[in-house]
């Protein structure tokens, strides 16, 4: 362990915080000018280690604070950081931070940043090796000089101090002080014993006269006890009689009171039932009026339906005759259309075949005429040209023109083909559309029937929902037991009335409950419930009374035990309680006591386990989640059958005990009880409030359900009505769509016919274009062949022959074409006639007849007699149901009225019984008051008798039996005689015996105490002897060690010399003989008390010459001897580190080197740390680390410097 670092602030010359760089664990040297702050640095360390500056006054503390320019320093501190790697400090940490802080009014220590006392710091330092008896690990300026100038006697005192004799002296002084106190006590005891012996002699003479007085007094007390005891027994007997009468009367009164309370409850129930029946009667009257209104409306609707049914029946015959005529016309037109379509179907294939043959003949004719025309053109053309060149030129021009024409024709051909494709696509779309319209018109009757069925189904669904909206099954809950159909809206109106009544009951129950607590608590509980709803707090459970149930037998006991705790609010955690309390405080909404479950702590109790006790908590039914709250309130209470048993268990087990009636005994012995009015029960009030709240919430929830059901029914009805309207609209569209459909079909047919005609025209045009294109291509081929042939003015023979053949073929082809064209024209004419007849005559006629058929069917559907008959049956059934319901309502009203009459009679009888019970209770109450007055007077007499008996004091045994059978008059006479005899002893000291006994006991006690003091004095004498012996041994042992170390160290410092310590005794003063105790084998023949001093004898030049006393040496030699003595003391009692302040100031150069080398040797060999200040260079040469102190602007600072800088500074100081 060593000093690792020092931090100074505000101490003497160190104003600002000065953090000194860590010290070396070996040898550290500090240099600086005089007045720079070196000594203040050492003073700071001594300030912390308490070597000095122990008991500081205000002025002394002020002197330690820095004084300089600027703001005044109000506090200062010095902090030393020790390296504790060797764990000499028992802290378990590698470092120890010790700080001392002072101010004008404070002086405190801290260990590792924690406050500590001065004793703690001193004990810790001593445990690490800082000896209180050896302060020489710190050597300030002047201490070496003081050792040099010490007298031999002072040096002996120093040796004793190092040996630790101060401890022995302190314990010896304490022992002597105790011995002095013991002697003083012994003297006082002797004085008291003398006084007691004198007083006992006086009391011995008074005992005989006192003995006679006591005999007469004993007789008096026996007689008085007999009289008082008999009077006490008479009073007790009379009190028992009164108590028996009271108990019997109380039981009768309790029975009558219970009957009275039960009668009041029954009357309240009857009144509630009467009110409910009357309310039911009002509801039934409303039902009856509404049912009669519905019956009138249903009868009116039935009459209208019957009238409509008759009208439909009259119109049905005329409709059937018109339909027969229409059916005949429709059949004739359909037959004609079928004939025409059959003929057209046979004609169309023949027409197509004839047309194909005509097209083939025309193609052959066109081809032959084209070839003949080319040959004629060639024949006439060749005559125009002179040579082949002209011909070829013309041919090439023609080929070019024809190719251009071919391109143009091909373009027209492509466009025509596209037009044909478009028309075919249109036809492909029109044909299925036309077919669909035809099928739609043909199937229109089925569609109308299907739509009619859907419309009827929608009507049935609408009527069913309307009935469901009007009527529901709802059981009656009060007087009547019948179940009748109620209307939802009517039930909703009833629930509104019930809700208002329930809300009023809740308000009444809340007012009743609030009267049982203070106003602020009532407001607070209401506010907590509101806050819970508004903020949706889950951990707020409710008041304690709301969280449990109990049997009525134990209700009074539970209320008495809980008291106002019934209204404490149970929450899950204190955080929840804090949150609610903050809101309550902000709103100023009353006061509430919370019970946070996480903060409640219950201790296990020794509950009695017996047949006549029951733990109260076992009689409560509650959720185990609230166990802590109920244990906190009820866990320490038991239920006992009576107050006597309760008192016994309360005293023996330290619990609270109560009876079922509410009488209570707590563990401190207090008894409470009396009458409890069960009609003012807080638990009943809480239960009543909870009941009406549940009723209110139930009815409110039912009202919400009804409204929701009504809304759902309204939505279903709206949806059904919408669906019905949609279907009726669809039916109307179907009924009215006959004309538009047929018009659309005609339009589609016309368009389709037009497109077919266009298609035929386009196809004919396409064939013509293809023929023209083929002719142009043949022409180009012929021109190209002619271009490659030789030039001739006339046709060749082959061409002439071909021309002749073509002329004959063209005539034949033309005749064939004309025959085929005639056949095709004939067939086409017939086909056109049939198509026009169908399109212009028969199909329109058919459409007209079908439209008329649909109209007839529509007219028949609108007056559907079946639908009217179904509506007639439905209305008849509704009237029957209404009649049945009216009969049930009448019956229910009659039953409700009978029940009201019956309950009213019962209520009147109960009221008469209650009046009689009240009179009986009042009469007994008056009797009880008289009995209580008698009991009070007798109890007072009994108390006086008991007080008189207690005044008699301790009675002899014969007092209880001696006059047991003696007549009371005789006892009174004897008492009179005894009192007369006692008058003669009025002057007697009645406390002589008591005083004699007290003085005897005191004498024995004092004698025993004196013997103890004698033994204590012997023990103290023995202790003083032992302490003296140990002190002598410690001094002799210390001298031997210091003497041996002094000789060794002196020899190291002065190798050529020799030094030793010499003990001086009283017997040596005349002879001046020296007694060298250096030899360890020599026995001590003289007591330490004979020691008068310690001398130093040294020789600096020889080990054998005569030695000199220290007084004979020079100043430097004296300082060296003093240092050798310091080193010897330190060697005997090593410290963790050493502080030397300019110890080499007065040494010669050669000895300074030796001292410096000694410090280095000790540091290396013992791992001791040295922190030294010096003005000499010798220590700097062996130092491991050098520091320089400077003084600037009236403040000191200390920094690390190199050895060279330190040496330079020392040299400058010399110059």
From Swiss-Prot:
Transmembrane segments: none
Residue numbers binding ATP: 32-39
Recorded name of the encoding gene: sudA
Matching SMART domains: SMC_hinge
Name this polypeptide is given: Chromosome segregation protein sudA
PANTHER family referenced in this protein's UniProt entry, alphabetically: STRUCTURAL MAINTENANCE OF CHROMOSOMES PROTEIN 3
Presence of keyword Transport: no
Organism name: Emericella nidulans (strain FGSC A4 / ATCC 38163 / CBS 112.46 / NRRL 194 / M139)
Molecular-function GO terms, alphabetical: ATP binding; ATP hydrolysis activity; double-stranded DNA binding
GO biological process entries: cell division; chromosome segregation; mitotic cell cycle; mitotic sister chromatid cohesion
Stored Gene3D superfamilies: 1.20.1060.20, 3.30.70.1620, P-loop containing nucleotide triphosphate hydrolases (3.40.50.300)
Pfam families: SMC_hinge, SMC_N
Region ranges (Disordered): 313-332, 654-676
Domain SMC hinge: 538-650
Function: Involved in chromosome segregation in mitosis.
Swiss-Prot/TrEMBL keywords: ATP-binding, Cell cycle, Cell division, Coiled coil, Mitosis, Nucleotide-binding, Nucleus
């Amino acid at each position: 362990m060593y000093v690792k670092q020092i931090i100074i602030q505000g101490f003497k010359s160190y104003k600002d915080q000065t953090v000194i760089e860590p010290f070396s664990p070996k040898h550290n040297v500090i240099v600086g000018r005089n007045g720079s702050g070196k000594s203040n640095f050492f003073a700071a360390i001594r300030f912390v280690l308490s070597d000095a500056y122990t008991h500081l006054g205000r002025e002394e503390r002020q002197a330690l604070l820095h004084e300089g320019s600027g703001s005044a320093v109000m506090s200062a501190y010095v902090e030393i950081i020790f390296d504790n790697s060797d764990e000499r400090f028992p802290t378990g940490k590698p470092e120890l931070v010790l700080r001392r802080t002072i101010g004008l009014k404070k002086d405190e220590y801290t260990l590792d940043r924690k406050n500590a006392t001065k004793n703690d710091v001193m004990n810790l330092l001593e445990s690490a090796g800082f000896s209180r008896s050896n302060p020489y690990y710190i050597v300030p300026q002047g201490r070496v000089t003081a050792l040099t100038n010490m007298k031999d006697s002072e040096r002996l005192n120093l040796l004793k101090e190092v040996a630790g004799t101060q401890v022995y002296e302190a314990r010896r002084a304490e022992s002597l002080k105790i011995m002095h106190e013991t002697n003083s006590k012994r003297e006082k005891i002797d004085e008291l014993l003398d006084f007691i012996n004198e007083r006992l002699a006086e009391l011995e003479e008074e005992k005989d006269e006192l003995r006679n007085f006591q005999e007469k007094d004993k007789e008096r007390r026996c007689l008085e006890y007999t009289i008082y005891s008999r009077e006490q027994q008479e009073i007790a007997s009379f009190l028992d009689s009164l108590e028996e009468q009271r108990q019997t009367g109380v039981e009768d009164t309790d029975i009558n009171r219970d009957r009275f309370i039960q009668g009041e409850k029954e009357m309240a129930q009857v009144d509630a039932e009467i009110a409910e029946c009357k309310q039911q009667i009002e509801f039934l009257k409303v039902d009856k009026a509404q049912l009669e209104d519905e019956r009138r409306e249903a009868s009116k609707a039935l009459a209208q339906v019957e009238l409509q049914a008759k009208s439909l029946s009259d119109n049905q015959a005329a409709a059937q005759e018109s339909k027969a005529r229409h059916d005949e016309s429709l059949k004739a037109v359909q037959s004609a259309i079928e004939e025409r379509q059959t003929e057209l179907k046979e004609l169309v294939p023949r027409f197509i075949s004839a047309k194909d043959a005509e097209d083939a003949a025309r193609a052959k004719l066109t081809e032959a005429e084209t070839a003949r025309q080319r040959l004629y053109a060639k024949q006439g053309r060749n005559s125009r040209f002179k040579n082949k060149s002209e011909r070829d030129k013309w041919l090439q021009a023609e080929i070019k023109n024809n190719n251009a024409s071919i391109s143009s024709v091909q373009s027209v051909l492509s466009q025509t083909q596209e037009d044909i494709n478009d028309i075919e696509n249109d036809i492909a779309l029109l044909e299925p559309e036309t077919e669909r319209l035809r099928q739609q018109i043909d199937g229109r009757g089925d569609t109308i029937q299907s739509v009619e069925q859907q419309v009827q189904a929608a009507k049935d669904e609408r009527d069913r929902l309307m009935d469901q909206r009007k009527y529901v099954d709802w059981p009656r809950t009060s007087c009547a037991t019948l179940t009748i159909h109620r209307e939802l809206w009517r039930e909703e109106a009833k629930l509104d009335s019930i809700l208002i009544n329930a809300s009023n009951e809740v308000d009444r129950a809340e007012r009743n409950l609030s009267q049982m607590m203070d106003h602020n608590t009532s407001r607070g509980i209401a506010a907590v419930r509101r806050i819970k709803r508004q903020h949706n707090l889950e951990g707020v459970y409710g008041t304690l009374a709301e969280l449990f149930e109990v049997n009525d037998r134990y209700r009074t006991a539970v209320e008495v035990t809980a008291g106002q705790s019934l209204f404490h609010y149970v929450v899950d955690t204190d955080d929840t309680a804090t949150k609610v309390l903050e809101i309550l405080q902000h709103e100023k909404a009353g006061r509430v006591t919370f019970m946070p479950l996480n903060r409640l702590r219950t201790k296990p109790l020794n509950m009695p386990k017996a047949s006549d006790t029951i733990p109260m908590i076992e009689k409560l039914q509650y959720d185990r989640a609230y166990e802590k709250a109920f244990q906190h309130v009820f866990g320490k209470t038991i239920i006992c059958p009576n107050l006597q048993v309760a008192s016994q268990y309360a005293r023996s087990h330290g619990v609270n005990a109560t009876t079922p009636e509410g009488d209570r005994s707590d563990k401190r012995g207090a008894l409470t009880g009396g009458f409890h009015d069960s009609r003012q029960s807080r638990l009943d009030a809480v239960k009543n409030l909870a009941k009406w709240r549940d009723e209110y919430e139930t009815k409110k929830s039912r009202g919400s359900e009804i409204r929701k059901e009504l809304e759902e029914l309204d939505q279903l009805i709206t949806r059904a009505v919408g669906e019905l309207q949609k279907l009726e609209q669809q039916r109307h569209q179907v009924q009215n769509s006959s004309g538009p459909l047929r018009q659309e079909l005609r339009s589609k047919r016309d368009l389709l016919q037009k497109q077919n005609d266009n298609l035929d025209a386009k196809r004919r045009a396409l064939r013509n274009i293809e023929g023209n294109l083929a002719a142009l291509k043949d022409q180009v081929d012929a021109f190209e062949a002619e271009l490659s042939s030789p030039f001739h003015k006339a046709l060749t023979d082959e061409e002439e022959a071909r021309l002749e053949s073509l002329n004959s073929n063209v005539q034949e082809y033309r005749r064939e074409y004309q025959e085929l064209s005639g056949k095709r024209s004939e067939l086409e004419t017939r086909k056109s006639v049939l198509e026009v007849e169908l399109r212009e005559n028969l199909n329109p006629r058919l459409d007209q007849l079908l439209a008329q058929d649909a109209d007839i069917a529509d007219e028949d559907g609108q007056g559907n007699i079946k639908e009217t008959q179904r509506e007639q049956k439905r209305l008849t059934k509704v009237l029957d149901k209404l009649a049945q319901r009216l009969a049930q309502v009448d019956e229910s009203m009659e039953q409700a009225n009978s029940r009201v009459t019956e309950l009213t009679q019962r209520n009147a009888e109960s009221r008469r019984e209650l009046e009689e019970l009240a009179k009986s209770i009042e009469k007994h109450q008056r009797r009880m008051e008289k009995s209580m007055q008698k009991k009070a007077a007798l109890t007072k007499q009994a108390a006086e008798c008991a007080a008189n008996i207690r005044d008699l004091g301790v009675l002899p045994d014969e007092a209880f039996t001696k006059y047991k059978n003696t007549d009371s008059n005789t006892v009174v006479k004897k008492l009179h005689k005894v009192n007369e005899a006692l008058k003669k002893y009025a002057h007697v000291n009645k406390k002589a015996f008591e005083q004699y006994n007290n003085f005897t006991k005191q004498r024995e006690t004092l004698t025993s105490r004196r013997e103890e003091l004698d033994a204590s004095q012997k023990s103290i004498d023995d202790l003083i002897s032992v302490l003296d012996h140990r002190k002598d041994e410690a001094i002799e042992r210390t001298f031997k060690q210091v003497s041996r170390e002094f000789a060794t160290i002196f020899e190291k410092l002065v190798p050529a010399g020799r030094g030793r310590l010499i003990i001086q005794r009283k017997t040596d003063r005349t002879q001046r003989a020296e007694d060298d105790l250096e030899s360890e084998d020599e026995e001590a023949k003289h007591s330490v008390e004979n020691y008068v001093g310690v001398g130093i004898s040294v020789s600096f030049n020889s080990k054998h010459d005569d030695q000199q006393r220290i007084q004979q040496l020079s100043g430097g030699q004296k300082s060296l001897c003093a240092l050798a003595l310091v080193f010897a003391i330190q060697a005997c009692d090593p410290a963790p580190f050493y502080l030397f302040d300019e110890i080499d100031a007065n040494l010669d150069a050669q000895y300074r080197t030796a001292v410096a080398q000694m410090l280095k040797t000790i540091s290396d060999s013992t791992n001791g740390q040295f922190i030294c200040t010096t003005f000499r260079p010798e220590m700097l040469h062996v130092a491991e680390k050098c520091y320089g102190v400077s003084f600037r602007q009236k403040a000191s600072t200390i920094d690390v410097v190199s050895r060279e800088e330190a040496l330079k500074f020392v040299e400058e100081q010399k110059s």
